[in-house]
């Protein structure tokens, strides 16, 4: 049995809709606050993909009326220099959100730098206090990519409660926080990873399947239950194009919903980053 009509989960369209709402909210709040919300993005080195992501974030800020403060450091910048900039941004009243663009050069400890960001300005939702708040189910800043996945599922009215959700990947960026968010919505959650022995058997049992590994075409048609919802978080460069972790053409034949790459989760991550920054701004009212 195969599903003949698969609906595309259009992250680009939803992200634009969210950003439109954020822009309207900013226009309303700008006068009482005396300034727009501000997002600072720290980038170290010359990773081409990171440079594209940073430009996209800056463009999105401009589009909705949010101030952006880009900080670009050379590859050989010391951890102390980055730390000094984080301390300065923590104290800057114009800045409501701080993001460190990952990955960082190998000589820098991303975790220790993330820990130095004021939790109230943690636009990426990766500070231990915010991750701990997620574990406890508190109202806190949520990790952007997992929050974007959840927003997509909710926008398309996809049932989550009681469903078996399989997350492939256990990173602190996506896999672990997403599993917690799905659990919060009463899904039964399985996390699969590089040491999982029976991956295809597990993915075939998923009502909601979220690969987040960074390995092109990892999930093939035969690994997906007919009618499953597939949200592809992976982004991989293959020759001259970007692809996800899913064999798109094959899985399109069996899934009931599927995200494209690009145009699926990526734009949602940026929208959630802006939403988190606006939330931090609003909490100063």
From Swiss-Prot:
Binding positions (NADP(+)): 169-171, 194, 235
One cellular-component annotation, GO: cytosol
Family matches, as InterPro entries: Aminoacid_DH-like_N_sf, NAD(P)-bd_dom_sf, THF_DH/CycHdrlase, THF_DH/CycHdrlase_cat_dom, THF_DH/CycHdrlase_CS, THF_DH/CycHdrlase_NAD-bd_dom
Catalytic reaction(s) noted: (6R)-5,10-methylene-5,6,7,8-tetrahydrofolate + NADP(+) = (6R)-5,10-methenyltetrahydrofolate + NADPH; (6R)-5,10-methenyltetrahydrofolate + H2O = (6R)-10-formyltetrahydrofolate + H(+)
Listed GO MF terms: methenyltetrahydrofolate cyclohydrolase activity; methylenetetrahydrofolate dehydrogenase (NADP+) activity
The organism's place on the tree of life at top rank: Bacteria
Enzyme Commission numbers on file: 1.5.1.5, 3.5.4.9
PANTHER family cross-referenced by the UniProt entry: C-1-TETRAHYDROFOLATE SYNTHASE, CYTOPLASMIC (PTHR48099:SF5), C-1-TETRAHYDROFOLATE SYNTHASE, CYTOPLASMIC-RELATED (PTHR48099)
Function: Catalyzes the oxidation of 5,10-methylenetetrahydrofolate to 5,10-methenyltetrahydrofolate and then the hydrolysis of 5,10-methenyltetrahydrofolate to 10-formyltetrahydrofolate.
Name of the protein this chain belongs to: Bifunctional protein FolD
Organism whose genome encodes this protein: Microcystis aeruginosa (strain NIES-843 / IAM M-2473)
Upper taxonomic lineage: Bacteria, Bacillati, Cyanobacteriota, Cyanophyceae, Oscillatoriophycideae
